Amino acid sequence: TDNPHLMADGQYEAMLRSLPDVERKRLLEGDWDVAEGAAFPEFSRVKHVVEHFDIPTNWPRIRAADYGYSAPSCVLWGAIDWDNNIWVYRELYAKHLTAEQLADRILEAEQLDPLPHYTVLDSSCWNKTGFGPSIAEVMMRQGVRWTPSDRNRVQGKMEIHRRLADDPYSQEPRIRFFSSCQNIVKQIAGIPLSKTNSEDVDTKAEDHAYDALRYMLMTRMSGYASIHQQLGAIKNHVHKVQDEVFGY
């Protein structure tokens, strides 16, 4: 059992806080989702997972997908708040769906949503193996529009790290996930690093939700997002101390 004297004077908690990320999360926060060798040890259910709330209708929406048939398809929906944070609020995760069937499921899920401002799909879905339409073309014919993803794996991983980190002003992470998005939460918590490339994840692990998230975060957002960036620049300017003596 825990030593009550250590608990009383805070030494025990201080000791737990000094542990490596994975051990600290397990013993101090009770978070056993993050695995040894995980690519994202900074991920925390306490910080990064939230319960459902009604997304404001004026937050731009983004949809991103990784397509598979024998392997699962994953579609993620996110909303961008006025501080340019992303809230991943819905996921669709299923095997053995044709491109037409997946498009129908997406349209069904979005019936009550505002139209997404940004839509991104694995760029390999534009490849053709014969004379027929590509996967992307089939879905677009069904009324589900897409743009090709940026497939840069290393930059995509780094963008996830950046989003998981706290904003220096708000002290809050730049991305959060609804608790109903179980597959992306599971994969971000547990996906391991590559054994041959420390800058990438293990591509042999289940990574379909991870890939969809990577595509989402690598999207070159414009319009509303550029307004968010302008607001962020104004906020940065307001917080910036111009003179160390007088503070202006």
Predicted regions and their residues:
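Mg2+-dependent endonuclease catalytic cores in nucleic-acid-processing enzymes, primarily RNase H-like
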Residues: 82-202, 223-236, 240-248
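Glycine-rich phosphate-binding/hydrolytic loop that grips phosphoryl groups
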Residues: 158-161, 210-217
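Short, hydrophobic alpha-helical segments
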Residues: 216-224
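Short acidic/glycine-rich loop or secondary-structure boundary segments that cap or lie
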Residues: 36-37, 52, 71-74, 97-100, ...
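ATPase catalytic-site recognition across NTP-hydrolyzing enzymes
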Residues: 4-67
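Short beta-strand scaffold segments in enzyme catalytic cores
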Residues: 73-79, 214
